[in-house]
Amino acid sequence: MARIAGVNIPNHKHTEIGLTAIYGVGRSRARKICEATGVPFDKKVKDLTDADLEKLRDEVGKVTVEGDLRRETTMNIKRLMDLGCYRGMRHRKGLPLRGQRTRTNARTRKGPRKAGVALKK
């Protein structure tokens, strides 16, 4: 099993699909990496030579992926929360950021329903 950027790439998949196992590499970026290195994107990972894998490692190393990308994303969200801007407040409250309605729906962001308080008669 090939290892690129600290991630095991599945052997039985094509190179383009296998590279998407790396956090921060999608289909389009995987194809660009394959084109830049000259590795055929429809070749299986198990059929790649050590030289091909080394080229892929070098090319993936030029892109922000895995832990660095996660850290950068987390820091961006933290920065918004520290600024106290609208998006930061919505992150802090766990509500949708981009203007979606919240009177109904938004369950993914808000979490499971909480029992309402019953009024005393």
Curated annotation (Swiss-Prot):
UniProt KW Glycoprotein keyword: no
GO molecular function, one term: tRNA binding
Gene3D superfamilies: 1.10.8.50, 30s ribosomal protein s13, domain 2 (4.10.910.10)
InterPro entries: Rbsml_uS13_C, Ribosomal_uS13, Ribosomal_uS13-like_H2TH, Ribosomal_uS13_bac-type, Ribosomal_uS13_CS
Membrane-spanning intervals of the chain: none
Family matches, as SUPFAM superfamilies: S13-like H2TH domain
Keyword Repeat: no
Entry keyword set: Ribonucleoprotein, Ribosomal protein, RNA-binding, rRNA-binding, tRNA-binding
Region (Disordered): 91-121
Gene Ontology biological-process entries: translation
Superkingdom, natural source: Bacteria
One annotated Gene Ontology cellular component of this protein: cytosol
NCBIfam families registered for this protein in UniProt: uS13_bact
HAMAP family according to UniProt: Ribosomal_uS13
Function: Located at the top of the head of the 30S subunit, it contacts several helices of the 16S rRNA. In the 70S ribosome it contacts the 23S rRNA (bridge B1a) and protein L5 of the 50S subunit (bridge B1b), connecting the 2 subunits; these bridges are implicated in subunit movement. Contacts the tRNAs in the A and P-sites.
Record family assignment: Belongs to the universal ribosomal protein uS13 family.
Subunit structure: Part of the 30S ribosomal subunit. Forms a loose heterodimer with protein S19. Forms two bridges to the 50S subunit in the 70S ribosome.
Record-given protein name: Small ribosomal subunit protein uS13
Organism per entry: Cupriavidus pinatubonensis (strain JMP 134 / LMG 1197) (Cupriavidus necator (strain JMP 134))
